[in-house]
């Protein structure tokens, strides 16, 4: 893809059809900056928000409540740029995966800075993504490419 925005839009609209709901927090890049997926004339998706802790991590009870509302996709950002660059620990991702599986919905990860997170955490990028059904990462963030995302 030419950009992370397009990569995320393709993922969101692959998992959801027009008018379906996506569970995410209101600070995520996918919502704050890439809003077109939520415009009626483009993606037509409806945002449902979960809350973050003071540390910038998803509040599990808030996610569980959102999943009960009939959403079709759980969207996460890892690392979460607008939450201070917080890295979502595997323990948190595993709990979120369990909740999503119970609800029968996929997880999309906006991993724009995935490889930065891998280096900082000492984890393999595939391990960080292991609980997601789809992942977008930018080749222009820490990998030296002038633009592009996968």
What is the role of each PLM region?
Residues 2-150:
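Conserved PLP-enzyme active-site core in the AAT-like
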